[in-house]
Amino acid sequence: MKLSKKKMQRIDNTLEKLFEWSHLNGYDNWLTNQLALEKEIEQGYRCETCKLVIKSVNKDEIVCKCINEKR
């Protein structure tokens, strides 16, 4: 399929706008993720085994009592 120069230009313009839009929204998505993370920290994290909510700043350092009791 051969496209005319006018159609090619229109496609280029659309792609350029999409790229700009996604680039601009990249920051918004990052900000949204940060806000969601802060909200999750406020509420605490749920233990996947016993569903207990644990308050902690760092999700990687969470060790629930139920895991310690099993050992």
Swiss-Prot record:
This is Uncharacterized protein ORF6. It comes from Spiroplasma virus 4.
